[in-house]
Amino acid sequence: MRVLVRAGLILLALLIIAGVAGGFWARRQLTASLPQLDGTLTVAGLSAPVTIARDDLGIPTVVGKSREDVARALGVLHAQERFFEMDLSRRRAAGELAALVGSRALPPDREIRVHRFRAVARRALAALEPRERAVLDAYTAGVNSGLSSLGTPPFEYVLLRQDPKPWLPEDSLLVVLSMFITLQDYTGSYESTLATMHDVLPAEMVAFLAPDGTEWDSPLVGPAFSVPPIPGPEVYDLRTKRSKLPEHIEMRPPRKEETRSTPNFQLPTPNELPTTNAQWSSLIAAFMGVDGSSPELMLGNESRSNDAIGSNNWAVAGRLTEDGGALVANDMHLTVRVPNTWYRAWLEWPDPSNGSSPIRLIGITLPGVPALVVGSNTHIAWGFTNTYADWSDLVLLELDPQDRNRYQTPGGWRNFERHDEVIEVAGRAPEHVSVMSTIWGPVIEPDHRGRPRALRWVAHDAERLGVASAALETARTVDEAFDAVNGLGTPGQNFVVADEQGHIGWTVYGSIPRRAGFDGRIPQSWADGSRGWNGWLAASEYPRLRDPQSGRIWTANARVVDGEMLARLGDGNYEVGSRARIIRDRLMARERFAPRDLLDIQLETNAAFLSRWRDLLLKTLTPSVVASDGKRAQLRDLVE
């Protein structure tokens, strides 16, 4: 018995020692992967020393002797603090997540491989201007230097038992492409839905369900559109469920297997922690939302269907402020995540054209890209919201009756291009995916009638893709900023800007296709050449608004303009204008502004869009109605 007790005590002691040793090892691994916050770091390739100072919030100020040196230092910072996030962004766009986290990431990888963004990024890299390429190369070298200077790789790779792959210049372009995926409809689902509705529903029903606007619209140019009436019983009778639908169309709720649900992820208990590589991969994949049933939720890259996406910005002219300086406010509503999407920084280097004053960029950067996304250069300040304009079109393909491997083009019959995409998968053999392409873009799934389609999307145009705009970094006026951003190869954004002279303005940041022969609302054939994209709008053709009479500008993902300007932008499923209405009303309610007043609008909690429904509920849930039903009483308590 004593022998057994002694053996048990020895075993317990060994387990305790192993646990303590494991804890020390884990702590050491985690500590060694943390960024260097002080001291000196040797980085090859710098033309002169760079200083990095952090404020009380840890926000770095980077001061160097050249744009390339500052880009290199920013790469070091991004790599040491956000490399895993950067890795996920490039892999998301390239369709290479499964190589990191295993087979659970195959559905989103398969879905995105149709775009062949790795090839797009490589073509874009080859087309960069020498100045932009030099900045990108310096940033890339900084990323790899920062990563290699860590004592151990970021802890996520330790858990996955993987080694981080070096950063490539093309990877920064993939990060830009990942934002296209986040901010635009990369499957053509909105246009496809509209086409189906037009095909199977009465026109009155389509007008009601997919109106051109709502009573909440508060555009900068033009009035709100009239609201279509609710279709009467002669169109669709809710009591008898009779409608003027074609006989082959059935209206029914979706079956269970046709619906998607958000993964119900729960953190494991200590006894459930993974012990194998596969288990860790599965856990991390589940935590990030990499689930075949919901690829749109993965990795914090929001799809267009995610209602959490939305942003607000507005500006007031200097003539309305207390000190005569124009003001810009911006809040970008990407999904809240840890770490945050953005990385705040102050970047500074000498102005080659004016040695007496430096170029200063203050605001937020995107890990993986060597540029300031939103902020100020001390002469102008700018902010973004997603436009929800129409950035893609579905093309109906006409197949050769004699050879289904050919499709009609304005130049005659043409063979489909076929590509064998190899998806590497951690822990198992790679998977091969066959992708077909046309002169307009990749072939996607057929429509509801079985007709083949291709997707024409601005993100596929490599020659317009970029990572940094030197012209925006040095712009001094609203007009110079307009010229800098019109035509850039980035996701189309509402660009609201103010300059130090007190001027304000709005335009579109990004490349706008020039549609010919159609409006882009529903899919059509481009085979005879009468319809299609005829290049891109010139800067002089872009919608621009400078110093409106009201002295106020606002955008919130809703429609901003009407008439010819709206025709050029198209409708990519604009948001209901309730946020824009609230912002406009709050701006119009004041005659003078200070920064605090703009912050008060940002902190607004009034949900005006819901007020009418609250009033209707309270009117309906009378004391006599709720008296006999506890659930109704609870509902009234919630909305009172």
List where the protein language model places each region:
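Substrate-recognition/specificity elements adjacent to catalytic centers across diverse enzyme folds
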Residues: 20-260, 264-271, 276-327, 332, ...
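Acidic/histidine-rich, surface-exposed loop or edge segments in extracytoplasmic proteins
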Residues: 115-127, 460-466, 561-565
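Sec-exported extracytoplasmic/periplasmic mature domains
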Residues: 126, 141-152, 289-292, 474, ...
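Ordered core of a single globular domain
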Residues: 197-203, 463, 471, 476-482, ...
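N-terminal Sec-pathway targeting helices
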Residues: 1-17
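Glycine- and hydrophobic-rich flexible loops that cap the catalytic core of alpha/beta enzyme folds
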Residues: 308, 337, 347-371, 375-380, ...
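Hydrophobic alpha-helical segments
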Residues: 444, 488-590, 626, 631-632
